[in-house]
Amino acid sequence: MVELGRWGCAAFVAPWLAAAAQAEAPRAVVQNTPDMTFSGSARIPACVVSAVVDGDPAKGASLAAVRASAACSIPWHWHTANERLVMVTGNAQVQMKDGKAQQLSPGGFSLMPSKHVHRFTCTTKCMLYVLLDAPFDLHYVDAQGGEISAEQALKGVAKKPKKPK
């Protein structure tokens, strides 16, 4: 064990204290799913809707509740933020580029580091929470890893599956 002493300890902790001071003060949130307002986005398949629970995805870290219908898939993509997701209901598959698809069931967790290419499919109707540590962005990629438009990426997705309720 390394002895830091009073000043060594202060030097060790100072960067975290500075970051915490700059972060937005947390607020209390207690919310049930029926009270959330879900909506879709042109950049995401029509079978996915989300509701911001905390934060502002346009400006920084955020938490969103996400619902999707069975067989709903978000094609290969990446985010600038680190993405954490927790399954609440239903089952899904998460596949990292060059990896095998992994099954997620209620209570399951996945972490996709910044710019890590992945795809996500709800194999049954599902709900999950997604936590991002930076503003939300979505970069779709083709089979070779080159960035493509949302329109190109979503052409291969089933046409307007029934929206989840």
Provide a role label for each language-model segment.
Residues S114-L138:
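Ligand-binding loop in jelly-roll beta-barrel domains
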Residues A11-A21:
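Hydrophobic h-region of N-terminal signal peptides that target proteins for export
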